[in-house]
Amino acid sequence: MAKKNDSLGNRMKGYESVSRHFLTRRMPAIIRLDGKAFHTFTKGMKKPFDPIMTQAMQSTMKYLCENIQGCVLGYTQSDEITLVLTDYATLQTDAWFGNNIQKMVSVSASMATLAFNQAFSAISAEWINQQIHQFPTMGTETTREVHTYIVKRNTALFDSR
């Protein structure tokens, strides 16, 4: 039973510590991030490697390698990213989140989600802009109307191949 003067935060940390697990220090840690339902997400994309998807995954991996402490190697294939982390570059090197598995997994997944969404959005927007500039501007009235609409609304477009 918690004492009356315990703060809510301290009690919650106590509950969390029961299931807290740590990796062994001074050993490489491998994090594998796998896309959820990417078979549905990639429906309609070029097989086997859509250039927009590939570029977004590479950009995501690069972001993770640059922003996760101790990351020495990143590898991406399909909808998976593998990262190798070390905490033995020097004797004073600390492990990312003290090798707390729950923290490493949850934060790396959220970082990957953020980076992928930003990269995919930017790369898709660039592709859409390229398509708009290839769209014929001369010709029928309908063609001109479609072009005008796309140019004015291009921030709301999404590559739905």
Report each predicted region and the residues it spans.
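Regulatory and interdomain segments flanking nucleotide-handling catalytic cores
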Residues: 1-161
